[in-house]
């Protein structure tokens, strides 16, 4: 049984009220449903974070690294509370705050990280790995707008941006100190140095991969795994020289290019630009992930000689 079973309804009610005050400057009486949802999500996220920190004190014998372009995670508040054994306590706490728990759960948007069967399969694997107590990290992109929201106007489908992060970012823990750098374009040359062949990459465009971690709770266990989502950012927010010359749009080109990588899940690819963007997404995602896995392994063991013994890498593809 998870330790979280010891968390009472009263403790959750007090914690949610504290988050409403600290993060939004409101009381439960005048908070919106959206604010109550975010406060509750932060409380559950902090519980997961404590469990994950406790669980990560020792290096695992072997860790699974699961790469997928999409994870159809759905909504997390009710699911995580249920998995932690505090679903009834959370429902009661919300009602004690004068809210309908069903309304608060309904307020949460689906995480805009997946679309179909491939994403649902990936999410099921993450849930199962956590439930079985298998150390695992999932990797994907932190899509800003998901795929799209569908609206029917005059009998026709209209696609609208899915701004899920407006509320969904309550689950994310950005870790800029663990950012990786991905290089696009440029040229490669080789040279010999003291009998060793050196490969040099030059004149490339740099894009930062900022990890935003989402914690995944297993059912009826204290084991928690991580879904690491990469957010693409330019290391140079703006070209000040071009901006000073009045070339405002061109001054933002580098930032716009970087941002586009993690904006939309499955951008339209019936034209060259769309195909190019999809390729950039996949290259960016894989490069950042492998750099992260390698860096963390070296930090833990100081060598790559045992890499194959400590890591299993699986790509979710069809």
Task: Give the predicted meaning of each segment.
Residues 1-318:
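A conserved ligand/cofactor-binding region detector
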